[in-house]
Amino acid sequence: MAKLTKRMRTIRAKVDVTKEYDINEAVALLKEMATAKFVESVDVAVNLGIDARKSDQNVRGATVLPHGTGRDIRVAVFTQGANAEAAKAAGAELVGMEDLADLVKKGEMNFDVVIASPDAMRVVGQLGTILGPRGLMPNPKVGTVTPNVAEAVKNAKAGQVRYRNDKNGIIHTTIGKVTFEADQLKENLEALLVALKKAKPSSAKGVFVKKVSISTTMGAGVAVDQNTLSAQV
């Protein structure tokens, strides 16, 4: 096991791993522990009451956070005709078909999100081995394969996060930067949890959201008491 640095020992000493913190206390603790020399992201891990081995219990989707993620998102769109003009007007950095596919094949992928209209999937389908491993392959389940590419671009730019449970039934995503106001982080977390609960598989029984933990990029996880979140959650 790797030896913990003095900084990490100091950070971990501030967190009671047996306690679920009030959301405001949890956020304050994160900000106190964020001592890295860069602006750290605030990440969340949500343990779901699902059996991830069963395909009908897997959770996948996307939602727009009310205060965004704090990242400047570059968007590539595979489409043509009027949709291409609409995508450009919505702020997409790269728009095209075969020409855009050629850039991807050359390894020129200066973008964070890929969106495609249904008619463009014949082109995008050839790029699965490149885009797939990078988590960039468009998928209708997360709204990145859609006839309304302009709306998808706006959502991506506005701070849409995509989520998908891992093999242990845990969702990992980001809800902003440590420089966000406490209320902004709280509202982003609440928006994510509302979206997750709406996506609850009908076959999942019992408590759906079992545990919520937040952390900064270089910090320790802090468990959140869900009873201190908004009533809508």
Swiss-Prot record:
One of its GO terms (cellular component) is cytosolic large ribosomal subunit. NCBIfam families: rplA_bact. Binds directly to 23S rRNA. The L1 stalk is quite mobile in the ribosome, and is involved in E site tRNA release. Protein L1 is also a translational repressor protein, it controls the translation of the L11 operon by binding to its mRNA. GO terms for molecular function: rRNA binding; structural constituent of ribosome; tRNA binding. Belongs to the universal ribosomal protein uL1 family. InterPro entries: Ribosom_uL1_bac-type (IPR005878), Ribosomal_uL1 (IPR002143), Ribosomal_uL1-like (IPR023674), Ribosomal_uL1/biogenesis (IPR028364), Ribosomal_uL1_3-a/b-sand (IPR016095), Ribosomal_uL1_CS (IPR023673). Keywords: Repressor, Ribonucleoprotein, Ribosomal protein, RNA-binding, rRNA-binding, Translation regulation, tRNA-binding. GO terms for biological process: regulation of translation; translation. This is Large ribosomal subunit protein uL1. HAMAP family: Ribosomal_uL1_B (MF_01318_B). The gene is rplA. Part of the 50S ribosomal subunit.
